[in-house]
Amino acid sequence: MPYSNAAHTLENETTSHAARVASRFCGPPHSGNGGYTVGMIGKRLGSEVEVTLKRPIPVDDHMQVVADPAGVAALLHADTEIASARTAELDLDVPDGITFAEAAAARANFPGYKVHPFPNCYVCGTNRCCSDGMCLFTGSVGEGVVASSWVPTAEFLNEEGGVGPEFICAALDCPGAWALIARYGIEGPFVLGRMTYRLDKPIYAGERYVVMGWALGREGRKAFCGTAVYDAEGQVCAAAGATWIQIG
């Protein structure tokens, strides 16, 4: 599997950061998108982080990210822990990318055009226009492998001038789910349970990128996948391994 299952606990002096997931950045109805939330928490720890989502993510409400200098953090809603995080090394074999043109062509085969468990999802929802959502519509490019073209907009930029971790991790989220659907024919909704991501290179607005997802395995209600973002030269900008949990 592409991550460890080690427990992590806040034990040292911590720092607290206000956090909020706007309802616009939803995944399932009335819950924040998992990848967006992963990046929101993980940016407090660094460029290689494991985040475990434990409960549905409240939207339009006040939360806190409490971080420990030892490299652990938690997302809290009042006294309830929504997610936990720790620095972790990503162990994932990333396949070679495809061309932007190939990824753009794959969008036409996105199965979510016909049946979509969460059509209002910020990342892959077909009810979201591309000025309101990310519109990452991944189509099959191989057995259990999906891809989409992606040209980030200036909205995604952070203060450093690159696409923020929230949006990079969002891009690393849903393509993995669609790869699992393509490989295993999973019916009914399933949600992100854990993501371990690594940010390798800055991602910029207006540039051409390819996002790919590939299935890695399935055990009962859990399924495992990898995702990556590639630049126009095929170099990996970011990658993630994830566990998804079937809830329907």
Regions of interest found by a model, annotated:
Residues 14-18, 48, 143-147, 194, ...:
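Intrinsic-disorder/low-complexity, polar/charged segments enriched in Ser/Thr/Lys/Arg/Asp/Glu/Gln
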Residues 23-27, 155-158:
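Short hinge/gating elements
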Residues 50, 72-74, 226-228:
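Residue-level detector of beta-strand face positions
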Residues 135-200:
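A mid-sequence, solvent-exposed acidic-amphipathic segment
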Residues 194-248:
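Accessory, usually C-terminal, subdomains that scaffold auxiliary metal cofactors
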Residues 1-18, 70-162:
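Non-catalytic linker/capping segments at the edges of enzyme domains
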Residues 25, 29, 37-69, 175-209:
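Hydrophobic beta-strand-centered segment that forms part of the acyl-chain substrate-binding groove
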